[in-house]
């Protein structure tokens, strides 16, 4: 539109100019050596204008002729690029649809048409993955990881390939490189953290967790929970060799999550062994308020080595005041009363739990009471038989694996904080009770 208006304006100006010259006749005199030429001004003007137009036309034709090969080449390039992007688009759809043959064909076409296009390289790698050609996919991702523009994408592809081949050390290195390049990227943070936990690299996992906190990859509550678990894991590893350091770590975990039983249990156990009974009792009692647990009660009872069974019974009574009606409180009291040979008090503690369907632990405690107080072998066998059929008690469980002791990671998947204190869903296995009967009968 603008060009048409420009041409129209030029024509109007030319016509008006020629009309102006036609209304004002004159001569253009040219004298050169022995020549004398008289030309009307109007005719000279028209001749000059025509000459200029012819020259411009000739230059334009010459330029088009000389530039023809270049334009033709550019046309071919544009056509090839258009064909490449069309193949790229169709290849992405084919990968999404799971069409291996079509994806491979379009990936090859896109690669030929767009040799420097990162998306074409990505499509080639994805089509290779789809067809199971891991070597080609790895080669493409390696090439991408060497270019700044596609480095992170290449590292992620290499990480996934290494993880698929169970090459965990290589996968860890790729994730660490990606994390160093861009800590704000979530996937290397989460992936590296999970691998460090599986390898029990608690120190490295804490550093990665700190990176996640700085870049807000995880909410604050989850950060505190994971940090407490990692600190407790470190304390558990150092308890025998560096008890002071282990106690510091466990106490830090306890401050983060006061209701976390393993942290309080380890801290209380170490403090009690180092003549810090009062501090140990305070830590254990605080966690007991949140989560009554048999390990806490046992450690609390023996917080001062050398105490008599009656002293331990008195101490347990001071603990269960915090949660008097909780089943764990009654079981802890019954344990302490049995050790102190206070049979009636032990019976009274368990009485409310017998009204419902008592668990195996309650039944075995009743067997101990019958064997210790009355030496009634028949009643002992009766309670032991009930214990075999009774509902199971809570235990540490992770991914279907039950454990008497807490562990920071799952023995199946290596996931951090997988163990839960709960009742198993499966039915209890039958266990022999003869040995236990003999032990109780000897009371």
For every predicted segment, state its role.
Residues 77-116, 123, 133, 161, ...:
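Alpha-helical segment of the N-proximal tetratricopeptide repeat
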Residues 146-147, 180-186, 193-217, 277-295, ...:
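TPR/TPR-like (Sel1-like) alpha-helical repeat modules
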Residues 120, 154, 188, 222-223, ...:
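TPR alpha-solenoid repeat register
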Residues 42-75, 100:
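Transmembrane alpha-helices and immediately adjacent membrane-cytoplasm interface residues
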Residues 125-129, 142-145, 152, 156-160, ...:
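Alpha-helical adaptor scaffolds
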Residues 103, 137, 171, 205, ...:
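Single-residue signature of alpha-solenoid repeat helices
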Residues 7, 70, 197, 203-248, ...:
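Intrinsically disordered, low-complexity, charge-biased linker/tail regions
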Residues 100-101, 134, 168, 202, ...:
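TPR-repeat structural position
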